[in-house]
Amino acid sequence: MESAGFQREKLVELYHREMDEWLQQFDAKDAGFKDGVPQWISALQTGNGWKPMELPAYWETRGLNFDGTVWFQKEVEIPADWSGKEISFHLAMIDDDDITYFNGKEIGRTSGCNTMRTYKISAALAKAGKGVITIRAIDYGCLLYTSP
């Protein structure tokens, strides 16, 4: 690169600056994520366009033909004998990134597609009864050819 007149450090700096700007624009279009704060993690969402989706699957095969952010929720029942114990939670692969919450608390995040996710619900969060898992799944599409 240097022999062609490019300065690697400046190109890397430019890349990171433009990627940060792109991601800020991307996040600004997510109604569930305002000013860096997730909005839909504390309670099971109903109405307001929330529809069931059979998973696992690429959401494009379920009628959502776009790249961007999709929020998923699932109400689960924590058995009494699991109460107060750490629980391992496994997700299938997500294309591309996720942030996962349990009862409003972030329990994990992973960047990159084709990566299995294993998160832990802490013993303090594991209480008998109903709980809500919320996943912010982000599919960036092809970053080189799209706008946010």
List PLM regions with ranges.
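Predominantly extracellular/luminal regions of secreted and cell-surface proteins
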Residues: 23-53
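Aromatic-lined ligand-binding clefts that engage carbohydrates, nucleic acids, or primary amines
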Residues: 40, 50, 76, 81-104, ...
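Edge strands and adjacent loops of beta-rich recognition modules
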Residues: 47-67
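Short beta-strands within extracellular/lumenal beta-sheet-rich domains
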Residues: 66-79
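Short strand-edge motifs at loop-to-beta-strand transitions and within beta-strands
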Residues: 72-74, 115-119
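Short hydrophobic beta-strand segments in globular cytosolic domains
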Residues: 107-108
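Short, surface-exposed tryptophan/glycine-enriched loops
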Residues: 118-132, 136
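Conserved small/polar residues in nucleotide/adenosyl-binding loops
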Residues: 145-148
